[in-house]
Regions:
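Extended ligand-binding regions for polar small-molecule ligands
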Residues: 1-29, 35, 62-74, 136-158, ...
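Juxtamembrane/start-of-transmembrane alpha-helix segments at the extracytoplasmic/lumenal side
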Residues: 260-270
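Soluble periplasmic/extracytoplasmic beta-strand elements of cell-envelope proteins
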Residues: 42-44, 131, 221
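Inter-domain helical "communication" segments and dimerization helices
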Residues: 117, 158-160, 266-268
Length: 270
């Protein structure tokens, strides 16, 4: 299930941690104290992954920022979100060590990759599964698949719909919208994205199927210019959180009530 805890801790200092409500050491407390209101940690996440993370009127919202706020507040670390409005701005921030202290949605292929870049990494905190979004009248054949123009040479779409024509979209919302409008047969997106879209779709014509594979593990990454002990501090906070926290946070974004639907329709019509 998405959000399942991985019991393996990748932070070397905390290999034996199983219990919750972990106390911080004196050394950790002194590091936490360095990140005061006057010196907050500058935090980055992707603004184009609703409901995982998105920018609403200059404020970062979504499952991942909500989760980070919980653990940072638990640890007593002051933080400030950077507010990129587009994916390009997000990528520019990622490359800028002057402005970005940590990235909270890093998908690392290997632990070595983090070491090479001299990053500190937390334990994984969310495992994302993919879903296939289609119309209800989908016949099982994908002639046209949507994709976002990102650099992956062997994209998910190549693996899931080999030989299908690709329809380029600028966002994942646009990918699902294209399927709804009949311009494409399927979109492959993260599970909660699919759930939020289908649940808010008043036409009733859309559906999604959860895929067992592949899965993607996300962690938080501390910049090479910051104290790497922060990764251990945040990992301790993760292990102190309720087990279903990710699912509970997701439910706020993926379940819709009738009153909210009218607003969603209003957005769609404008």
């Amino acid at each position: 299930v998405e959000g399942d805890w991985k019991t393996t801790l990748y932070n070397k200092n905390y290999e034996s941690i199983e219990n919750k409500n972990l106390e911080y050491t004196e050394q950790e407390k002194s590091i936490i104290a360095q990140y005061s209101k006057d010196n907050p940690l500058h935090v980055l996440c992707d603004p184009t992954r609703y409901p995982y993370s998105y920018n609403e009127n200059g404020e970062m919202k979504g499952i991942i920022p909500d989760y980070f706020r919980k653990i940072a507040d638990y640890a007593g670390i002051s933080y400030e979100f950077l507010t990129p409005a587009t994916r390009d701005e997000y990528i520019a921030y990622q490359k800028n060590k002057e402005t970005t202290d940590m990235s909270i949605d890093a998908r690392l292929e290997t632990d070595n990759y983090a070491e090479t870049n001299k990053w500190g990494i937390t334990a994984p905190f969310i495992t994302m599964q993919l879903a296939r979004v289609t119309r209800r009248d989908f016949d099982g054949k994908i002639n046209v698949v949507t994709t976002v123009d990102q650099t992956a040479s062997n994209s998910i779409e190549d693996a899931m719909a080999p030989g299908a024509e690709k329809l380029m979209c600028s966002t994942r919302q646009e990918m699902m919208e294209a399927v709804r409008k009949g311009k494409a047969d399927a979109a492959f997106v993260y599970y909660y994205m699919a759930q939020a879209f289908v649940n808010s779709d008043t036409t009733g014509t859309m559906t999604y199927t959860l895929l067992e594979q592949p899965t993607f593990t996300y962690r938080m990454v501390i910049s090479s210019t910051e104290n790497h002990a922060l990764a251990g501090i945040l990992t301790k906070a993760m292990y102190a959180m309720p087990q279903n926290l990710v699912e509970d946070l997701a439910a706020r974004y993926t379940t819709y009530k009738a009153a909210e639907l009218t607003f969603v329709d209003w957005i769609r019509l404008h």
